[in-house]
Amino acid sequence: MAEVRASRVFQRFARFMSCGLLGWAPALFMYYARTLVPLLEKHPDLHLPFDGSVFTAFTINFGPRTVCYPHRDVKNLAFGWCAITALGDYNWRTGGHFVIWDLKLVIEFPPGTTILIPSAMVCHSNTAIGPEEKRYSFSMYTAGGLFRWVEHDFTPEKVYQETRNRAQAVVEGRERWESGLALFSTLAQLRGGTDKTTDKTEGDNI
C-alpha cells in the first residue's frame, strides 16, 4: 500500500475523486473537510492516505477479474459518498457494468471511469467480464465512525449513548438523517451556483 500511496497516478486519482465530490455535492464535501480539521488536531499521529483528498480510506481490488456482489457499505457514513474508479482492460459494452439495484440502473462503466454514489444507502454491484479480460477497482470513502467520534466530542459511542434516553436518541437520529440529506445538491442548485456552501477554506487546506 505504501507503493500505491507514493504513486503519482493514484495520487492524481485520489485528488480527482475528491474533486468529484466537491463538484457534485459541495456542501457534503465541506462537511467532510470540516470534520477532518478537529480530527487531525486531536490525533496528530493520523495521516490522510493521499494529500488533496477529503476521503480518509481507500480500497484496491487487485482482480485480475474483479466482480463485486450486490452489497451496501454499511460502515461508511450513512449519507456519505464513495468514489469508485474502474481500471483494467475489458470490453465495457459487454461487461463490467455498474449496477444500482434500488434505482434499477445498469450503467456502462469503462476503464478509467469514476462514479460517486451514497454507497451505504444504495445496493450496488458490477457485472462479470470476459475470461481473458482484466478489471481492477480503486475506491475512496470515509467511515461513519469518524464523524460520530468528532461530533460526540471524542467520546466512545457506548459512553455517549448512555447519556441519552431512547426518545433523545430517536430525535437525534431523525435530525441527523435530515441534515445529512440536506447536504445533497440538486441539479438546479449546481447549475445556478446557489449551493448551500461557498466557503472552501477548509477544503483548500486538505
Describe each model-derived feature in a short phrase.
Residues 79-80, 89-206:
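Catalytic core of Fe(II)/2-oxoglutarate
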Residues 1-139:
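Active-site-proximal segments of catalytic enzyme domains
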